[in-house]
């Protein structure tokens, strides 16, 4: 899907809290196809439009990696068809129950009932890739410090 190239994989973990000393060398190579696409024949990519799932860290313009072979279960983020279009939502409901709801994390969108036939599950989102250097809704844009001359 992405070609056969590999990228450098640092041997150290990156701290999300307090920084820790890091090694200055590369331990291995990582193939993003293997890391992001466990089942290539059932994996699809879709670009996100809108911010209804921003509460789940899924932003406008993000790239979703979707696996159609996985069983959707409550709590997972899924892609569904609704009104002739694809939507991304969190599946809510009881496990093993034929009914459920597709819920956005923005608190504004109306939940969609699966039982009423309004929507059909299409696949399970396994990764969301987003660009960190672009502005994020609700946050001030990244600004470089002014040079002191």
Language model features with spans:
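Short, positionally conserved secondary-structure boundary motifs
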Residues: 1-54, 74, 85-86, 97-99, ...
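Short beta-strand-centered aromatic/proline hotspots
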Residues: 76-78, 88-93
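Structural motif
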Residues: 61-62, 76
């Amino acid at each position: 899907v992405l070609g056969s190239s590999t990228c450098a994989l640092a041997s150290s973990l990156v701290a999300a809290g307090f920084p820790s000393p890091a090694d200055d060398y590369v331990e291995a190579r990582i193939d993003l196809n293997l890391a992001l696409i466990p089942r290539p024949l059932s994996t699809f990519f879709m670009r996100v439009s809108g911010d209804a799932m921003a509460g789940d860290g899924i932003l406008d313009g993000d790239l979703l990696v979707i696996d159609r072979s996985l069983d959707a279960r409550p709590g997972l983020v899924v892609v569904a068809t609704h009104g002739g279009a694809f939507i991304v939502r969190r599946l809510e409901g009881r496990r093993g129950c034929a009914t459920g709801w597709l819920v956005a994390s923005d608190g504004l969108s109306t939940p969609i009932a699966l039982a009423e036939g309004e929507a059909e599950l299409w696949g399970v989102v396994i990764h969301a890739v987003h660009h960190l250097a672009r502005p994020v809704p609700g946050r001030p844009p990244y600004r470089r410090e002014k040079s002191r001359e």
